[in-house]
């Protein structure tokens, strides 16, 4: 695992990172709604097959949970951005700050592209279903990590309790 990461990081940091061979253009266009892990992965493979791919995402930067939910210590944003830049070099177009249904209609997307792939993520924290879970200062782990990633100010008070023991809870503790 460490060897794979070393080789991958070294390639991404080189002047000429590996870009897979791109098949001849198919003449088909694909819109991918959502620029998180699934959207980025799909765009990579669709572009490799010769399709004209556009990612449409509501956030200011692509990456979804990779950017806004996983802390820097687990996934350096510089590495993520280099991966996204590589996908752009493959010819994938990236349209950010665009909310489907608000800034751009789904109907317009369907009319413009031959295919549409929806890869919108699951950004919801599982709420505590108990008394007091709705008082000010109580927030879900995913919401907390997203606010930190966006450099939003959070008033944590003098003491904090993290409920849970999974990855999100541990990331919240370490953050």
Placement of each model-derived feature along the sequence:
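Ferredoxin-type iron-sulfur electron-transfer modules in oxidoreductases and energy-metabolism complexes
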Residues: 1-24, 148-149
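Glycine-rich beta-alpha-beta "Rossmann" dinucleotide-binding loop(s) and their flanking helix/strand
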Residues: 116-118, 122-145
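A short, charged/proline- and glycine-enriched loop
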Residues: 23-30, 138, 156-157
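Glycine-rich FAD pyrophosphate-binding loop
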Residues: 51-67
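N-terminal Rossmann-like dinucleotide/flavin-binding domain of flavoprotein oxidoreductases
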Residues: 3, 66-114
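Rossmann-like dinucleotide/flavin-binding elements
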Residues: 31-56, 95-106, 110, 124-126, ...
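Solvent-exposed alpha-helices and their adjacent loops that cap or buttress functional pockets
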Residues: 22-25, 110-111, 131-132, 152-155
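Conserved beta-strand segments of alpha/beta enzyme cores
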Residues: 52, 91-93, 137
């Amino acid at each position: 695992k460490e060897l794979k990461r070393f080789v991958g990081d070294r390639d991404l940091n080189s002047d000429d990172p590996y870009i897979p061979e791109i098949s001849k253009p198919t003449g088909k266009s694909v819109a991918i709604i959502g620029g998180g892990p699934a959207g980025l992965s799909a765009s990579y493979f669709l572009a490799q097959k010769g399709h004209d791919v556009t990612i449409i995402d509501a956030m200011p930067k692509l990456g979804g949970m990779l950017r806004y939910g996983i802390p820097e210590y687990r996934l350096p944003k510089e590495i993520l951005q280099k991966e996204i830049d590589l996908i752009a070099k493959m010819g994938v177009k990236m349209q950010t700050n665009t909310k489907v249904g608000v800034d751009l209609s789904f109907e317009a997307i369907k009319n413009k592209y031959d295919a549409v792939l929806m890869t919108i993520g699951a950004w919801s924290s599982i709420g505590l279903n108990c008394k007091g879970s709705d008082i000010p200062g109580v927030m879900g782990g995913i919401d907390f990590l997203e606010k930190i990633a966006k450099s939003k100010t959070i008033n944590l008070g003098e003491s904090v309790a993290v409920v849970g023991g999974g990855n999100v809870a541990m990331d919240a503790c370490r953050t």
